[in-house]
Amino acid sequence: RFLAEQYQAPKEKREARFPLTLNTGRLRDHWHGMSRTGTAARLFGHVEEALLSMNGDDMRRRRLLDGQLVKVRSRRGELLLPVHKDDSLRPGQAFLPMHWGDRFLKGLGVNSLTLPAFDPISKQPELKHAGVEVEKVELPWQFFALVEGSVQKRFEALRPLFEGFAYASFSLTGRERPALVIRAACNEPPSRTQLAQLEQLLGLDEGPVLVYDDPRRSVGKRVRIEDGRIVALSLSGETAARDWLKQLW
C-alpha cells in the first residue's frame, strides 16, 4: 500500500553556527557495525579508517588539508577524525560513514552528531540531515603503529591504553599478511611507562629493532625487520614518515 504524504522539511536547517549538512550511510565493503568486516583484514582494508568527506571549496574556506585532523561539531556532540577531500559532494555537504563506533574510533561515532527526529509514518530516523561545523584541531603529539600477527589479540590488549588520547583510530589491513594499524594524537606526550607498554605489545621492546629517540622533542621511532621485511613499526611524537614506511611494508 502506497501513502501519498505531504512533504515535510528536515527538522534541522543550516545556520551560521552549523553551516554544513552532514549525511551518513554505509560504505560498499563494510558490514553494518563491523561485526564481520571488523575481524577480516582483507575486507577492513577497503577503507581503513573513518574519514569525514568534504567538498574541496568548503575545505579551502576553512584552511583544511586532506588527511588533517578536524573536529566535527553538532548541537548534540563532537567527534575528532581526519578530513578527506571529495569533490563528488556538493558544497555545503559532508559525509561520514556509519560503521565506526567506539570500538575502532575514540568517541561514539556519527550517532553522537545526528539528531533523534524520525519520520512519523515509517519511524526511519533522520540520519541524513544534521547541521554541523568543521574546524581544524591542533594535537601536536601524534602516534602511528603497524604490526603483523595476532591482530585480534593485540587489538584487545592495546585498545584500553588509548582511552586518554584525544583521538585514536584502530583498523586492520593486508591480504596475505594481516596487520593492525593504529593512529592516535593528543596534546601532551604520554608517560614513558605507557609508551613502554605500547612497545611491548607491538613487539618492539627487544630483539633486532631499529631505534631512534629524541627525548627533547618527545619523538621515538621503532622498526622491526625480519627476513628483509618490515613486520612492525611505531612512530611517536611526529609521524611524517608514516605513508612512506607503510608503502615499504
Language-model regions, residue ranges each:
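Structured loops at beta-to-helix junctions and adjacent beta-edge loops in soluble globular domains
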Residues: 3-7, 23-26, 99, 137, ...
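Short capping micro-motif at the N-terminus of alpha-helices
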Residues: 2, 81-83, 233
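Histidine- and/or cysteine-centered catalytic micro-motif in compact active-site loops
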Residues: 25-27, 57, 75, 235
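Generic detector of well-ordered alpha-helical segments enriched in charged/polar residues
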Residues: 3, 195-199, 242, 246
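A generic local secondary-structure boundary/capping motif
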Residues: 9-12, 121-123, 221
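Long, contiguous, secondary-structure-rich segments that constitute the structural scaffold
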Residues: 17, 33, 37-53, 57-205, ...
